[in-house]
From Swiss-Prot:
The lineage of its organism: Bacteria, Bacillati, Cyanobacteriota, Cyanophyceae, Gloeobacterales. GO terms for molecular function: fluoride channel activity; fluoride transmembrane transporter activity; metal ion binding. This is Fluoride-specific ion channel FluC. Na(+) binds at residues 76, 79. Pfam families: CRCB. The chain crosses the membrane at residues 6-26, 35-55, 66-86, 100-120. It is found in: Cell inner membrane. GO terms for cellular component: plasma membrane. Na(+) is not transported, but it plays an essential structural role and its presence is essential for fluoride channel function. It is a multi-pass membrane protein. Signal peptide: none annotated. Its main location: membrane. InterPro entries: FluC. Keywords: Cell inner membrane, Cell membrane, Ion channel, Ion transport, Membrane, Metal-binding, Sodium, Transmembrane, Transmembrane helix, Transport.
């Protein structure tokens, strides 16, 4: 139990740090806060990675410890449902309903598509 908890903690810390770096990169590249785009990017990339990890776990019988580190830990720390929720609420409070709905649908459908693409890509390797 302690070993597994440490694996999740280390993976989560690395995933959170990676998400922070993506946000910084988006801010520097776009010259604006990573609101919406940064969150969408990490959620889509994280869904792709988790889909691939799932495919490999089935095909290669990956050690459960690696799944805890990379899946629950890293992907869990890298992606962020809470930021998606708050960003949608901010858009709704501003009355920007089309952007809020587009962002929500794009995140959900894009996440499903990215997860499926990651799964298929990993199976093809």
């Amino acid at each position: 139990m302690v070993r597994e908890s440490v694996l999740v903690m280390v993976g989560g810390a690395l995933g959170s740090l990676a998400r922070y770096w993506v946000g910084l990169g988006i801010s520097q590249w776009a010259g604006a806060p990573p609101f919406l785009f940064g969150t969408l990017l990490v959620n889509l990339v994280g869904s792709f990675m988790l889909g691939g990890l799932f495919a490999w776990s089935v095909a290669l019988r990956i050690d459960p410890a690696l799944l805890l580190l990379a899946g629950t830990g890293f992907c869990g720390g890298f992606t962020t449902f809470s930021a998606l929720s708050i960003e949608c609420l901010v858009l709704l409070q501003k009355g920007d309903y089309p952007t809020a709905m587009g962002y929500l649908l794009g995140s959900l459908l894009g996440g499903l598509a990215a997860g499926w693409a990651g799964y298929l890509a990993a199976k093809a390797l």
